[in-house]
A protein has these predicted regions:
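Short helix/loop segment immediately N-terminal to the Walker
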Residues: 66-69, 73, 112-115, 212
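Short glycine-rich substrate-engagement loop in P-loop NTPases that contacts/grips substrate
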Residues: 43-79
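Short hinge/gating elements
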Residues: 7-10, 82-83, 127-130, 149, ...
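Walker A/P-loop
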Residues: 2-43
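Basic, amphipathic alpha-helical bundle interface domains used for macromolecular binding and assembly
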Residues: 166-212
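Canonical AAA+ ATPase core
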Residues: 6, 18-21, 27-30, 58-64, ...
């Protein structure tokens, strides 16, 4: 759905980030290199500049004219991309969580004296088990995620199947699949599906069952 948010949680190495990247490549037709630009990797020392963007350096050095007398903001790819991934979200400091809260809650960001309404996006976040490097997520921040799905490790039979896979498939250009699929069109179709009051209650029940 438009502005859909989902958190994937589970053990280390369970494929949460890989799944998020593959889905982005499929639905937004992004290359391996471009999908990496859409990822914000959680870290306790993340600054506002690393999350949102920075002032135009060319303007600061006088090599480019100001925009109506003001310095322009060069927004990071994470901010402007249609597909966003926050990797290891529980490594974000409370400060970083507050910066991202307006993005998730209102679809807008602000840096320096400029703000921007973020284009429609889909956001996935990954959550690993607690350790010494993790930070507790605030309740308002967690509440901005519509769904939280557990990602379990493969069982023995699944590991055996994975081990037998043709290694040449690792070089597949995932972005070339589903070429006829347009994410915005799918979201519009979903938005216009009619449903009864009973169906809405059932959907809300399912969503409530998959929240942190």
């Amino acid at each position: 759905v438009e502005r859909g948010t989902m958190m994937l949680y589970g053990g280390h190495g369970g494929g949460k980030t890989t799944l998020s990247k593959y889905l982005g490549q499929l639905f937004c037709h992004l290359t391996k290199e471009k999908i990496e630009d859409c990822i914000l990797r959680g870290h306790p020392q993340l600054t506002e500049e690393k999350i949102l963007g920075s002032l135009d350096f060319a303007q600061m050095t006088g090599n480019k004219p100001l925009d109506n007398g003001k310095l322009s903001v060069v927004w990071n790819e994470f901010v402007t991309s249609r597909w966003k991934i926050i990797d290891e979200i529980n490594r974000l400091s409370p400060y970083a969580q507050n910066i991202l809260l307006s993005l998730l809650a209102e679809g807008s960001v602000k840096y320096h004296d400029q703000s921007m309404i973020v284009p429609a996006f889909t956001l996935f976040a990954t959550l690993n088990p607690k350790d010494n490097a993790n930070t507790e997520l605030s309740l308002p921040f967690k509440d901005r995620f519509a769904l939280a799905l557990p990602i379990t490790m493969p069982d023995y039979d699944s590991f055996s199947t994975i081990g037998k896979r043709d290694k040449s498939s690792y070089n597949d250009r995932i972005e070339e699949y589903l070429q006829d699929v347009n994410l915005e069109e799918l979201q519009e179709i979903v938005k216009n599906i009619p449903y009864t009051e009973e169906a809405e209650l059932f959907i809300n029940y399912i969503i409530a069952s998959y929240r942190l």
